UniProtKB/Swiss-Prot annotation:
Pfam families: Arg_repressor, Arg_repressor_C
GO MF term list: arginine binding; DNA binding; DNA-binding transcription factor activity
The family this protein is said to belong to: Belongs to the ArgR family.
Biological pathway: Amino-acid biosynthesis; L-arginine biosynthesis [regulation]
GO cellular component: cytoplasm
Function of the protein: Regulates arginine biosynthesis genes.
Subcellular location: Cytoplasm
Record keywords: Amino-acid biosynthesis, Arginine biosynthesis, Cytoplasm, DNA-binding, Repressor, Transcription, Transcription regulation
Protein name: Arginine repressor
Top-rank lineage group of the source organism: Bacteria
Species of provenance: Anaeromyxobacter sp. (strain K)
GO process terms (BP): L-arginine biosynthetic process; protein complex oligomerization; regulation of arginine biosynthetic process
Principal subcellular localisation of the protein: cytoplasm
Length: 160
C-alpha cells in the first residue's frame, strides 16, 4: 500500500467516524493522525474517494460515496421534500444545498429511465429518457429516493 493509499484510508476513516464540515477540519484531523497533506492533495483525495459535502439539518458535512449500485441515493434519503411531474419533466425539491448531491447520485446510479439532470441549490430538473412518461419516472425516483409516492396515473400529483 502506498503512502497515498494509506492517507486516503485515513481520510475515509475520519469522515466515517466524525462530522467533518470543512477541508480545514479534515486537514487538522489528518495531521493529528500523523499525515501531512496540502489542501490540493486533500481535494484530489476527496474526489477519488467519491466524498461530497451534503447539507443536512445540522449543517453541511462530508460523506463518502456509496459503494452500491444506487450511486449513493440511499445515503441521501430524507433530503427530498417533494417530487412532481408534468407532461415533459420531473421536478425534485430538496433541502437547501442538497440538490447537487442528489442529482449527482441519480446520474451515478444511471437509471435507464433518466436522460439527465440539472440541479440548482434546492431543485432538480430530471429529463426522462425516450418515450417514458414523466409521471412514471417520478414514481420510480420516489422509490429510489425513499420518498412516499402519491402519484396516480397522469394527474400530476405531488409526492411528499
Amino acid at each position: 500500500m502506498t503512502s497515498a493509499d494509506r492517507r486516503r484510508d485515513a481520510v475515509a476513516r475520519i469522515i466515517r467516524a466524525r462530522r467533518i464540515g470543512t477541508q480545514e477540519e479534515l486537514l487538522a484531523a489528518l495531521e493529528r493522525a500523523g499525515f501531512r497533506a496540502t489542501q490540493a492533495t486533500l481535494s484530489r483525495d476527496l474526489a477519488r474517494l467519491g466524498a461530497r459535502r451534503v447539507s443536512g439539518p445540522e449543517g453541511a458535512v462530508y460523506e463518502l460515496g456509496a459503494d452500491g449500485a444506487d450511486g449513493g441515493l440511499a445515503a441521501l434519503r430524507g433530503l427530498v421534500s417533494s417530487i412532481a411531474a408534468n407532461a415533459s419533466m420531473v421536478v425534485i425539491r430538496t433541502h437547501p444545498g442538497s440538490a447537487p448531491a442528489i442529482a449527482r447520485a441519480i446520474d451515478l446510479a444511471q437509471p435507464p429511465e433518466v436522460l439527465g439532470t440539472i440541479a440548482g441549490d434546492d431543485t432538480i430538473f430530471v429529463a426522462p429518457a425516450g418515450e417514458l412518461r414523466p409521471r412514471r419516472l417520478a414514481a420510480r425516483l420516489a422509490e429510489l429516493l425513499g420518498t412516499p409516492s402519491a402519484l396516480a396515473g397522469d394527474g400530476g400529483e405531488r409526492t411528499h
